[in-house]
Amino acid sequence: MIIDITEIMDWIPHRYPFLLVDRVLKIDPNKSITGIKNVTVNEPQFTGHFPARPVMPGVLMVEAMAQLAAILVAKSLGSTKNKEVFLMAIENAKFRRIVQPGDTMHIHVVIDQQRANVWKFSSTVTVEGEIAAESKFTAMIKDKA
């Protein structure tokens, strides 16, 4: 099931310049999700990171993983309209390859565990078949206030 940017914005609250998922390529609710982020030079982080050699910040790669996980949670639950997904912990984040404008990040997220409102994930970002980043992280789902 492919999910385009319009539907992505129905599932998560993020918007430009902080929406970091362009398309969902595959989703298996309660299991895994794969999506992409096309990295372009006109994104605001590249004005300072770094002007002479733009490099995608590692924390934004982890944020893209977390946003894709939020879509997976929403699709697994059927809706998160009255809920919010909060990142609680990031573990073992590793950055193995520079990601720069022109690259397409392929992001894969797997649910490792889910207990009540706490979900644990593992994720990788690949570019041209090479691992660029990997991380484990935990998120909490809460009712909106």
Swiss-Prot record:
Record-annotated active site: H49
Assigned keywords, A-Z: Cytoplasm, Lipid A biosynthesis, Lipid biosynthesis, Lipid metabolism, Lyase
Localization? Cytoplasm
Record's GO cellular component terms: cytoplasm; membrane
- Which catalysed reactions does the entry list for this protein? a (3R)-hydroxyacyl-[ACP] = a (2E)-enoyl-[ACP] + H2O
Top-level lineage group: Bacteria
Q: Name one GO molecular function term.
A: (3R)-hydroxyacyl-[acyl-carrier-protein] dehydratase activity
A biological process (GO) of this protein is: fatty acid biosynthetic process
Q: Does the keyword Cell membrane apply?
A: no
Provide an example Pfam family for this protein: FabA
Annotated EC:
4.2.1.59
**Keyword Lyase annotated:** yes
| Role, per record | Involved in unsaturated fatty acids biosynthesis. Catalyzes the dehydration of short chain beta-hydroxyacyl-ACPs and long chain saturated and unsaturated beta-hydroxyacyl-ACPs.
Question: Its family?
Answer: Belongs to the thioester dehydratase family. FabZ subfamily.
Q: Matching NCBIfam families, A to Z?
A: fabZ, PRK00006.1
Protein name according to UniProt = 3-hydroxyacyl-[acyl-carrier-protein] dehydratase FabZ
Originating species: Rickettsia massiliae (strain Mtu5)
Q: Which gene encodes it?
A: fabZ
